[in-house]
């Protein structure tokens, strides 16, 4: 807080650029990484109103060592504070820079010299309030720099990073142009992971109904894209190794396009292990893949374990790997037994077919409800810790919305491809309109389902932050059910799970 309003001059590497899609520069921002400290501010000379372009890093930093960046500051007091913070965060420390309205975004991957006003992130002062400082602390971000002005920039920049940055921006603009502001912003969140600018009502509606996970790039997205692409390449008779290589490369690029969040990294690692197991003709093991993903994420940065995305993503997969088998085992034999015997209809071929179809539908419905319940059981403590509320109806709602994602996501990606080709081939206008109509219909369906669910009695349970005693008791019960659950009859397992 003591640094608030201090004017700093920083140099570092530009990453994660964000530009508003309305064409203005309001809230345009980027992260500045590879920071280091230089206490002597006398070496900084501001050379004019416009940014100078230099050939190499040493000309920007004023240092002979091109591998080191300098932070030129206005007071020794600020220097000691930054030094102390950087020692805590390590060499990966960064700053979030918000540009002045008349400034253009620098190229991603370039090194720049900037100056602006320090704005520390706010800490939570009330229970339940979002802790901005803790959120950015886990991202190794020291502070925000407001009214940022760029005074120098290297000619060299990251070609792939800049391409992905421009592709992300153009894709957001295209979604809003084709689908309108509200649906376009929702589509950008689902496909690109860009929630900035999303309609606040829609965002609150999804969260209240318990389907906000659709707005996070996770295993659902990567599995649909990766598995779909891998299967398609095999169907066109490409070699399995080549199909896996192409799928891997496209998934890695897509993960970078969407920001490479924690849930995305977890899903990417697990999918790559799944592909590797197939190539080696081994059976993929879900718990092993999950453990490898956790190690790769936590070893370089242990504080990630406190991140909400990490906890929710991994707890969901734990539910799939551990709780779903416990709940589903044995229920295949229950649905067929729930049949009505009738002397008139028994033995009639048509009725037997209908009864068999009903039995299959019951088994399918039971398995999916139990799958949703199993995932919810492991995620529930973290949902209450981070959001202080839970929607019991979300278990049933997800039975409808998740299968629709298998249609929605390919339509959204297809719209990006078709809309770009329509300028060259006008015959694609009809497919483009059909894709837009299908997407808008699914979004409308989502919205109506959410409104219906939130209108039901007990749609949202406001629990507040759970006590450690409640969390401990719940965890012990969950472990006991996971360990000894298969020894119980299916009806008792379900009763224990609900309790």
Describe the predicted segments one by one.
Residues 12, 116, 190, 218, ...:
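Divalent metal-coordination and catalytic microenvironments
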Residues 199-394, 463-499:
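Hydrophobic alpha-helical transmembrane segments in multi-pass membrane proteins
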Residues 1-213:
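Membrane-interface helix/helix-cap signal primarily in integral membrane proteins
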Residues 159-161, 165, 191-196, 258-264, ...:
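Hydrophobic alpha-helical transmembrane segments
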Residues 160-173, 327-330, 334, 344-365, ...:
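Short helical patches
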Residues 3-7, 353, 357-377, 396-399, ...:
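Functional transmembrane helices that form membrane-embedded active or gating regions
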Residues 326, 373-380, 407-414, 445, ...:
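Transmembrane alpha-helical segments that form the membrane-embedded catalytic/substrate-channel core
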Residues 152-162, 208, 384-400, 412-474:
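Membrane-interface amphipathic/re-entrant loop segments adjacent to transmembrane helices
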